[in-house]
From Swiss-Prot:
Organism: Pelophylax ridibundus
Localization of this protein: Secreted
Keywords: Amphibian defense peptide, G-protein coupled receptor impairing toxin, Secreted, Toxin, Vasoactive, Vasodilator
Summary of the function given for this chain in its UniProt record: Induces relaxation of arterial smooth muscle, by targeting bradykinin receptors (BDKRB).
Record protein name field: Bradykinin RL-16-1
Amino acid sequence: RPPGFSPFRIAPASSL
């Protein structure tokens, strides 16, 4: 996983 990869960045993105 790259240093800029975040699993939370994908989940919240769908919530928004």
